[in-house]
């Protein structure tokens, strides 16, 4: 099996005789393994397993313990997160446990597949028989160990400190571990499991709570708050408050003591480079680049225009040639002749030639030629095309009167088209004249012309956006101070007028004499009351046309110009907070109230939604559960309370626990809370001293015993700690 490890493999495994036991402290956080009789474990690592794939070969490898960050580039860990063999503090994933034991025995120096040393392994208090039996089966069947013994880690820590005079033979051990907390009373040096208690709260929850609080407080830096970093911050900054309520009040009032108790964590920060104003040479260089880009764009546009003119000239030549061929064809055969060309008649072909000719003249910059019908004298136009216009009605027949009305309508329409064409021609001439003047100004001073054009564009854009806002929100007299937008403020002017007319028509119904319709103006109300009237406001106005012209012009002469989309100006012109550059203060993590708020869950688990008792109440629960009610025994127990486990390293733990227990005990009861010499390693050291005793094998059981007595026998199995 391929292992990835940074732990050095031991080389003296074969020097130990088979009678020397191997001691394992199988904690939910860390796995420790070593030899009996020694004071330090040989191998220590995180009790987790990862099985990522190697990016190059695709092989699945096993990583036990923490992964070296420098090796992350070689493995794909996205599909395989860290896995623990524990559920709370009970081993239930024995496949993961086998990976961990394989790795531990390999790092200890074991060769081959068998382990010929007795094993003492720790477990939690009141471990379920299913977990205990499967662990024994794994050690016997997979590794072939000769004998196995199970012991409680907190009990080994208590007995080890009892040997060194830290605690007495009667007392209570409180062990806030990684995922759970246990309270076990000791009477005459032996644990009384009937009086033990457990809560599902531990150091993991403290670390996770700190990680969540900091991520909510600094969402910009949430990726920095990894679980490992939160664990380091907990060990470095967290403490137990003597009085949680008063400590909270201290920070709420912002006293000087609160500032002194605040810690800081400075994240790496690199100041942004200072912006140096461009030199005159740089400005000139950029202007030359812009001019060069503008010239290239103009050349591209000119080449495109020439290509378009050539295409239209070729099209016009082919159309005129086709028209000559049509002239040589009989009138009845023209539709058949034109069937393959896409034209239905001679008139359609001539209309196409006229349109192409007009487009060609426009592309060349020449003035358009008006159709012949508009170049004629208006008098001859009236006399020839509309002969009935000047004839009196009294001498015309009914049919001629109808023709006269039709001719009058056609004449009015033709005159309207003529006026529209003349107006368009005048506008085009004015536009060409204006373009020529602007081009002359641009050639004289390009920089000044560009700045002026940009200012005009911004001004027109603001007017257009203002009109759109007025159409959306309606007019306001400035008396609305609430800042809200109700239905009346959202209606446009046309919609409000229509609502007024509808309301007036409804309330005026039946009042007085109804004379509606006697005047032609009355019928205009239907148009005003129609919803289609709202679309009139949506027609493009002169400002929008001017905006389009300025935008097109800026795109021609300024390659860096980006046209603003609709609504962008309204977003930027509102009261939007200005984005300031990030400073060193933005990368400083302030850890104030979190220092004692997170560890407080050990005493009040309800802060994170766990409805269980805290550490101080657990001690009282263990005393009440004892089978004999003796006051002297209770006093002996409270006078020797040992704190062990990783969370007992938090500053202020002993004082807070003693204060909490004193509140639930009778007045004058002796209370003494002490901390283990090494809350982290004393469990392994106690187990090592126990396994080194000559009577160790009397507390262990062999595979033969396991096979003969069965799984139920392990239910009542318990070692005698007084041998230590």
Curated annotation (Swiss-Prot):
Q: InterPro entries under this entry? A: Actin, ATPase_NBD
**A Pfam family reported for this protein in Swiss-Prot or TrEMBL:** Actin
What GO biological process term is on the record, naming one?
A: regulation of cytokinin-activated signaling pathway
Where along the chain is composition biased (Basic and acidic residues)? Answer: 414-446
Q: Where is this region: Disordered?
A: 358-391, 412-450, 467-488
MF GO annotations: structural constituent of cytoskeleton
Where expressed (tissues)?
Answer: Expressed ubiquitously in seedlings, roots, leaves, buds, flowers and siliques.
Subcellular location as annotated: Nucleus; Nucleus, Nucleoplasm; Cytoplasm
Q: Which UniProt keywords apply?
A: Cytoplasm, DNA damage, DNA repair, Nucleus, Phosphoprotein
Family, as annotated: Belongs to the actin family. ARP5 subfamily.
Subunit structure comment from the entry: Component of the INO80 chromatin-remodeling complex. Interacts with EEN.
PANTHER family for this protein? ACTIN
Q: What is this protein called?
A: Actin-related protein 5
